[in-house]
Amino acid sequence: MPHDIPADAPAAPRHGDEVVTSRELVMALHRSAIGRLVMLSADGGEGGLGGVELGRAIARAGMSCILIDLTGEERIAAETGIAPGSPGLHEFAENLAPLGEIIHRDSRGACHVVLATGAAPQPDSPDVTLVLAACAEAYDCTIVALDARRMDSLPSLLDEETAIVVAGQAATPDGYATVAGELRSLGVDDLIFMQCAATRRAGRRAPDQPD
């Protein structure tokens, strides 16, 4: 799977090696032809919000960015302050809302967000394919947040301008190894690992930390 991140870009190869921060990853993106990042969570916790953190970092760096949430959960909507009941991919697929109405703005940043309202759609569905194609034309970078339990759907999201990022906390290195092992068993060996900056506990957000 070709990923055009430069050879000198920060990368986190094997278990036990250093993990990049969102800032380092943004620097690498500036020097590459990568236009899409598929985000997988290494721990099911903070890693599930890795796409939000990275999207904010990309937007702060002056690049246009959109986050497509295919996790089927509510974490990303809650973190970005998008109102419950806002239209998403389901409404778009059912012709209940045009593309422009399912694109929301992160309440704490300039990154745009598309939600998978209701059940998470299949990444290879015609509607997701159409949205991804439109976003590739309109944004510098598209982030696709995907449930790590749906790795079998990865091939439909990958091309020569796509990279896979495994996000999580430094305190849970085994999570990186587990997800990486599963990906490599599928023949995916070119991975980037990202350490999330903040820790959230008991539903309360910790103060922002520089990434």
Regions found by a protein language model. Give the residues of each.
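Post-Walker A helix-loop "phosphate-sensing" segment adjacent to the P-loop in P-loop NTPases
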Residues: 56-68
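A generic structural signal for alpha->beta connector loops
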Residues: 62-64, 110, 187-191
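Conserved catalytic-core segment of NTP-binding enzymes
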Residues: 124-211
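Acidic-aromatic/histidine active-site loop/patch
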Residues: 1-35, 87, 94, 170-173, ...
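Short, highly selective alpha-helical patches that border small-molecule cofactor pockets
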Residues: 47-51, 55, 176-180
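P-loop/Walker-type NTP enzyme "switch/lid" segment
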Residues: 6-16, 27-49, 66-140, 148
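Short, charged low-complexity intrinsically disordered segments located at boundaries
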Residues: 53-55, 120-123, 164
